């Protein structure tokens, strides 16, 4: 029975079809001026850039010049690269320009499509960022497409790991900048830790086109970019707690693989309390008493390390280090670390050296970073399954771009076996059968462990003519993937390793020329050898086509349909034939978690024998329903996390805007004066209650407060005894005394020095308090969920308490700045250079990208406070204290073992 919706779509087309058709008039207009554009000389074509910019300066919009601009880029691409964008690629370019996501199948030329809107939007002079998932793709695309932009008189920069600030500043100043998502986010955070505006490298967020947008804005949305600094060594504590976990039995804990959570049962809690008590680690009577919050955190991490994290699936151990494995690509991510002590728990489990924990100094999620852009667009081969998320969170529509040629790939029904062994046996038979007929095969696995298991079984069959592509050997990744289309080639790859590199039937011409003729100089010999490679690839392509094209064999379903579609999409590029099939077993993770027991019972009743498979569209639909459930749950998690992160993001915007204003100001005396006035108001209000009699005033407390904060010893107790004195009189006298003392100091310092001191103290104090605030919000976030048990909305509770914490931060800022400025003195000798804190930039458990760990060292200029001006009872007056100095509190201990220890908590 045909639905009314189906009839309507047949009559009028889908909404996607209508959106695509809406771009056709512009496509026709671009085609109509193609011959005229072709007739231009190179100089005339390049001069169009100047002409377009002049039109914009006169008031024209980018939409007004889209047609001639796209025509110019198309012609420049033809002349420079030998590639002429097809009509459907023009449509893709218009989709990107219109703030949307263009879903384009593998091999349809997304990289070339991007040049059209990139050039158009770069004409504004505000900069365009093209975002890729790794340094290799950023460099490759910048080098290739940069030739087109250069031909048209535009500059291209590329941001990769390891560049200096000067190099980054120059790259961001270009018309077009290629960069990874991680580098962009880290540069934003680092810019907002600088103390001079001219040290900042970014120049704003105008327009970004995100390649592999689903990977960056969906897969990585839950994992923030973090800049952190190391805390004190706690390796002994991790090792002690780790030793407890093997003593537990399954009834002592509960594991939820769906939610990736692990909790102790009542019996397990009692056993753990006894162990902790014997080790002298338990305070009070119970594990969950408030004073044991830190210990609870440690034991939970240890339990997860042993029961949820699997070696060679979630991480590998290499060179005495625990290295995270990307869940989606199977790549190693050296330098990346789990947060909140989880990585240290894994190191304790594996008996490798435990690295120090880190304290978060600055962080941001990709969700909030990319929403800062005035204009955002994206490209990918697989976005429709996440269309709702893109619309709700990023306000981005997903529009599917028609392929230039029809897709000929055959997607077969899944084959389901009862066990791993049966499944792998069938896969190996299928691989060898395809190899015999010369068909190239790409085998997709979900983990390193599975890829190596499959490779080992092939070797046992006496066959070793294959390539294994996983996290252990990713250096040759792009080349191996590019040659996976050679007839008879067998490539085993973890999930989507090598994403961004096309698999071309017969092999990749450009890569072969680069590898085989890289050292051969230009000339007749090189041209002859290039021609020989061209002919060889043509012949190999015909053989691969005759064998049926690329055959994608998947060893497991991923919990996301999108990842499965990405693997399928490797085959059948640009109208080539191809084939895909998924081989499953009831022992697979997805099947096991979602009802494999019932299916096993059903298959037994059907009389399924060992080695036999069931193939039926019903199985595919059942699995798709399970995947939709997982996708919906993950979307809800990301939506919920974003609601909480938005609270921090709103506060982050305020702080970063304040920092920028401070950096741009040469004189903040008025701001500092307002802070002093508000501090005095708070002091008086605190010690002189409203409508209270003079004898009820806390004169002693006010005197102490004035001494501790304002560094003024005033006869306040005498003032309050005066006949007829009021609250306003006390406030006025405090203000006059404070301003007089500050004015005298400012005159001694001189305007230039005083302005520098004020600015430095405000910025350093703001940074210190903001870092403490981030930690406080993290702690609040970790426990706020329990408010739900009291029938209160955790999110509303979080918003309310986060606001109170932020208000407290601002009050503390005013008080600390005032206290330091009232005590600061110039020292005669040049102060010793302070030791800079080591800061690491890392992205926790991300889902794509590699080798983008970016450590950095920063040193803030310090204002030295003379020891005689430090109040032992008020840390706000101590200024910068060296870790090995005697603590100003008078304890006699070193600062790092006394009050300095609190900074590390």
Curated annotation (Swiss-Prot):
EC supergroup of this enzyme: translocase
Binding residue positions for Zn(2+): 887, 889, 898-899
Major localization class: membrane
Record carries keyword Electron transport: no
Places the protein is found: Cell inner membrane; Cytoplasm
Cofactor: Zn(2+)
Gene Ontology process terms (BP): intracellular protein transmembrane transport; protein import; protein targeting; protein transport by the Sec complex
Reactions listed under catalytic activity: ATP + H2O + cellular proteinSide 1 = ADP + phosphate + cellular proteinSide 2
Presence of keyword Transport: yes
Cofactor note: May bind 1 zinc ion per subunit.
Pfam family, one: SecA_SW
Membrane topology, record value: Peripheral membrane protein
Example of a GO cellular component annotation carried by this entry: cytosol
Binding site for ATP: 89, 107-111, 502
EC number in record: 7.4.2.8
InterPro entries the record matches: Helicase_ATP-bd, P-loop_NTPase, SEC_C_motif, SecA, SecA_CS, SecA_DEAD, SecA_motor_DEAD, SecA_preprotein_X-link_dom
Gene Ontology MF annotations: ATP binding; metal ion binding; protein-exporting ATPase activity
Annotated function: Part of the Sec protein translocase complex. Interacts with the SecYEG preprotein conducting channel. Has a central role in coupling the hydrolysis of ATP to the transfer of proteins into and across the cell membrane, serving both as a receptor for the preprotein-SecB complex and as an ATP-driven molecular motor driving the stepwise translocation of polypeptide chains across the membrane.
Quaternary structure and interacting proteins, as annotated: Monomer and homodimer. Part of the essential Sec protein translocation apparatus which comprises SecA, SecYEG and auxiliary proteins SecDF-YajC and YidC.
Family: Belongs to the SecA family.
Name used for this protein in its record: Protein translocase subunit SecA
Lineage, highest ranks first: Bacteria, Pseudomonadati, Pseudomonadota, Alphaproteobacteria, Hyphomicrobiales
């Amino acid at each position: 029975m045909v639905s009314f919706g189906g009839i309507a779509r047949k009559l009028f087309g889908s909404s996607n079809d209508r959106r695509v058709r809406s771009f056709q008039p512009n496509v026709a207009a671009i085609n109509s001026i193609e011959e005229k554009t072709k007739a231009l000389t190179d100089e005339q074509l390049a001069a169009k850039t100047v002409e377009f910019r002049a039109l914009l300066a006169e008031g024209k919009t980018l939409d007004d010049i889209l047609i001639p601009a796209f025509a110019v880029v198309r012609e420049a691409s033809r002349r420079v690269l030998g590639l002429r964008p097809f009509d459907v690629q023009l449509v893709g370019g218009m989709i990107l320009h219109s703030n949307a996501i263009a879903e384009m199948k593998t091999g349809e030329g997304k990289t070339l499509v991007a040049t059209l809107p990139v050039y158009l939007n770069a004409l504004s002079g505000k900069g365009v960022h093209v975002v890729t998932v790794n340094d290799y793709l950023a460099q490759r695309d910048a080098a290739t497409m940069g030739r087109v932009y250069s031909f048209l008189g535009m500059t291209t920069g590329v941001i990769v790991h390891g560049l200096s600030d000067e190099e980054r500043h120059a790259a961001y100043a270009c018309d077009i900048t290629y960069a990874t998502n991680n580098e962009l986010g880290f540069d934003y955070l680092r810019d907002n830790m600088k103390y001079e505006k001219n040290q900042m490298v970014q120049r704003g967020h105008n327009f970004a086109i995100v390649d592999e947008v689903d990977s960056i804005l969906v897969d990585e949305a839950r994992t923030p970019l973090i800049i952190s600094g190391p805390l004190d060594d706690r390796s002994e504590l991790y090792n002690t707690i780790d030793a407890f976990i093997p003593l537990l039995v399954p009834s002592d804990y509960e594991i939820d693989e769906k939610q990736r959570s692990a909790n102790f049962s009542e019996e397990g809690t009692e056993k753990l309390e006894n162990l902790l008590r014997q080790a002298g680690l338990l305070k009070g009577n119970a594990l969950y008493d408030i004073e044991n919050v830190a210990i609870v955190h440690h034991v939970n991490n240890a339990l997860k390390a042993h029961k949820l994290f699997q070696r060679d699936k979630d991480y590998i151990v290499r060179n005495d280090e625990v290295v995270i494995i990307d869940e989606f690509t199977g790549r190693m991510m050296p330098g990346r670390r789990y947060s909140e002590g989880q990585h240290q728990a894994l190191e304790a489990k594996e008996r490798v050296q435990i690295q120090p924990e880190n304290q978060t100094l600055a962080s941001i999620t990709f969700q909030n970073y990319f929403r800062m852009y005035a204009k955002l667009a994206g490209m990918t081969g697989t976005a429709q399954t996440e269309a709702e998320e893109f619309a709700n969170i990023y306000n981005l529509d997903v529009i599917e771009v028609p392929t230039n040629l029809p897709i000929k790939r055959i997607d077969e029904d899944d084959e389901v076996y009862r066990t791993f062994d049966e499944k792998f046996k069938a896969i190996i038979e299928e691989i060898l059968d395809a190899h015999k007929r010369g068909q190239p095969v790409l085998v997709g696995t979900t983990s390193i462990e599975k890829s190596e298991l499959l490779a080992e079984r092939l070797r046992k069959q006496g066959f070793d003519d294959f390539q294994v592509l996983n996290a252990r050997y990713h250096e040759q990744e792009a080349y191996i993937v590019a040659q996976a289309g050679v007839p008879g080639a067998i490539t085993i790859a973890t999930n989507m390793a090598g994403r961004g590199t096309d698999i071309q039937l017969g092999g990749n011409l450009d890569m072969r020329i680069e590898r085989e003729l890289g050292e051969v100089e230009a000339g007749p010999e090189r041209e002859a050898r290039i021609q020989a490679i061209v002919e060889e690839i043509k012949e190999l392509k015909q053989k691969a086509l005759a064998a049926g094209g690329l055959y994608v064999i998947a060893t497991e379903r991923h919990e996301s349909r999108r990842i499965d579609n990405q693997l399928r999409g490797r085959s059948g590029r640009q109208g080539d034939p191809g084939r895909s099939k998924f081989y499953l077993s009831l022992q697979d993770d997805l099947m096991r978690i979602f009802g494999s027991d019932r299916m096993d019972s059903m298959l037994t009743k059907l009389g399924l024998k060992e080695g036999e498979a069931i193939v039926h569209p019903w199985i595919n639909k059942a699995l798709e329903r399970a995947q939709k459930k997982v996708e919906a749950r993950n979307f809800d998690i990301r939506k919920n996390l974003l609601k909480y992160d938005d609270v921090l993001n709103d506060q982050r915007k305020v702080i970063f805007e304040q920092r920028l204003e401070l950096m741009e100001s040469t004189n903040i005396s008025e701001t500092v004066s307002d802070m002093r006035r508000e501090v005095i108001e708070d002091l008086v209000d605190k010690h002189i209650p409203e409508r209270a009699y003079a004898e009820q005033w806390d004169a002693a407390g006010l005197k102490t407060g004035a001494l501790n904060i304002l560094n003024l010893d005033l006869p306040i107790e005498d003032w309050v005894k005066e006949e007829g004195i009021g609250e306003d009189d006390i406030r006025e006298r405090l203000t006059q005394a404070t301003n007089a003392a500050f004015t005298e100091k400012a005159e001694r310092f001189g305007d230039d020095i005083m302005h520098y001191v004020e600015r430095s103290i405000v910025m350093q104090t703001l940074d210190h308090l903001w870092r403490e605030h981030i930690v406080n919000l993290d702690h609040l976030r970790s426990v706020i969920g329990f408010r739900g048990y009291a029938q209160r909305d955790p999110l509303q509770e979080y918003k309310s308490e986060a606001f109170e914490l932020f208000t407290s931060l601002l009050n503390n800022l005013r008080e600390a700045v005032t206290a330091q400025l009232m005590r600061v003195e110039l020292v005669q000798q040049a102060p010793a250079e302070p030791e800079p804190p080591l800061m690491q930039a890392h992205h926790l458990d991300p889902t794509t990208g590699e080798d983008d760990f970016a450590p950095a060292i920063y040193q803030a200029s310090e204002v030295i406070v003379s020891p005689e001006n430090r109040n032992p009872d008020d840390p706000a007056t101590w200024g910068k204290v060296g870790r090995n100095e005697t603590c100003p509190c008078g304890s006699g201990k070193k600062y790092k073992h006394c009050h300095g220890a609190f900074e590390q908590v």
